[in-house]
Amino acid sequence: MTMSIRIGNGYDIHRLVSDRALILGGVHIPHELGLLGHSDADVLTHAIMDAMLGALSLGDIGHYFPPTDPQWAGADSLVLLSQVNELIRTQGWRIGNIDSVVVAERPKLKPHIKTMRDKLADILQLEPNQIGVKATTNEKLGPVGREEGICAYAVVLLVSSDEIS
């Protein structure tokens, strides 16, 4: 059975450490801590990529950009996102919309949301109103609440290119 829409969800979490930049949605966020990871550790962009891949049963970002491969060390996650977007397009799909949430106790993310949406929209060839980015805290619960890390969740709706034509 061929379906004209697909939905995927994604999640990512990285540890907060000193001496790293905090990048979310491709935006450098001023903060005394940054996220530790093989690439730039952009949890929002990683969650979106996993949702895109999951919607088409194409695995996860670790399959395409393994953390054991030195070629991806320090990689800009927006470059990886562009590659994932090209992959789903070659499979005959386009993004209908994205909804996401970043969970962090600090810093306050609201002032950066529009810039994140605009950057993601540019990379994904979408209108900013097709991308929802929200921020919340974990009410001081768990590792995110203790400010040990930041996590993000994303849901992506893919639409068959045949439906768009």
UniProtKB/Swiss-Prot annotation:
Binding site for 4-CDP-2-C-methyl-D-erythritol 2-phosphate: D12, I13, H14, H38, S39, D60, I61, G62, T136, T137, N138, E139, R146
Cofactor: binding comment: Binds 1 divalent metal cation per subunit.
UniProt key word Lyase: yes
Keywords noted in UniProt: Isoprene biosynthesis, Lyase, Metal-binding
Gene Ontology molecular function: 2-C-methyl-D-erythritol 2,4-cyclodiphosphate synthase activity; metal ion binding
Domain of life: Bacteria
Binding site for a divalent metal cation: D12, H14, H46
Residues the UniProt record annotates as site (Transition state stabilizer): H38, T137
Pathway(s): Isoprenoid biosynthesis; isopentenyl diphosphate biosynthesis via DXP pathway; isopentenyl diphosphate from 1-deoxy-D-xylulose 5-phosphate: step 4/6
EC class (word): lyase
Residues spanning the membrane: none
EC number annotated for this UniProt entry: 4.6.1.12
Signal found in the keyword field: no
Catalytic activity annotation: 4-CDP-2-C-methyl-D-erythritol 2-phosphate = 2-C-methyl-D-erythritol 2,4-cyclic diphosphate + CMP
GO BP field: isopentenyl diphosphate biosynthetic process, methylerythritol 4-phosphate pathway; terpenoid biosynthetic process
Essential cofactor(s): a divalent metal cation
Xref: InterPro entries: MECDP_synthase, MECDP_synthase_CS, MECDP_synthase_sf
HAMAP family: IspF (MF_00107)
Role noted for this protein: Involved in the biosynthesis of isopentenyl diphosphate (IPP) and dimethylallyl diphosphate (DMAPP), two major building blocks of isoprenoid compounds. Catalyzes the conversion of 4-diphosphocytidyl-2-C-methyl-D-erythritol 2-phosphate (CDP-ME2P) to 2-C-methyl-D-erythritol 2,4-cyclodiphosphate (ME-CPP) with a corresponding release of cytidine 5-monophosphate (CMP).
Record family assignment: Belongs to the IspF family.
Subunit structure: Homotrimer.
Protein name: 2-C-methyl-D-erythritol 2,4-cyclodiphosphate synthase
Gene behind the chain: ispF
